[in-house]
Amino acid sequence: MFAVIKTGGKQYRVAANDVLTIEKLEAEAGAIVEFTEILVVGVGADATIGAPFVAGATVKAEVVEHNRGKKVIAFKKRRRQNSKRSRGHRQHHTVVRITDIVAA
């Protein structure tokens, strides 16, 4: 069984026991989170497509850890002015393991 969930402004195709990295969630490591915005749920070619979400379908996942992504450097240089600016950013991520998919 698979599902397509929407979280953090992105869509992910998930199945049971999948481990994926998503945008940061406000949950402790080891906590169980529940995703209710399910776009598609089904087995193989037999899938239920939501409009926009499948009513009553949920996906449960366990929070494995919180981490940060690679550093992205924003570098600005102004020509002929001996002026430059370098700024770094690291995005926060949450690693989750899908435990259960409940279809309506």
Swiss-Prot record:
Cellular component, GO annotation: cytoplasm; ribonucleoprotein complex; ribosome
GO biological process, one term: translation
SUPFAM superfamilies: L21p-like
Keyword field contains Endoplasmic reticulum: no
HAMAP family, per the entry: Ribosomal_bL21
Chain's role: This protein binds to 23S rRNA in the presence of protein L20.
Quaternary assembly: Part of the 50S ribosomal subunit. Contacts protein L20.
Protein name: Large ribosomal subunit protein bL21
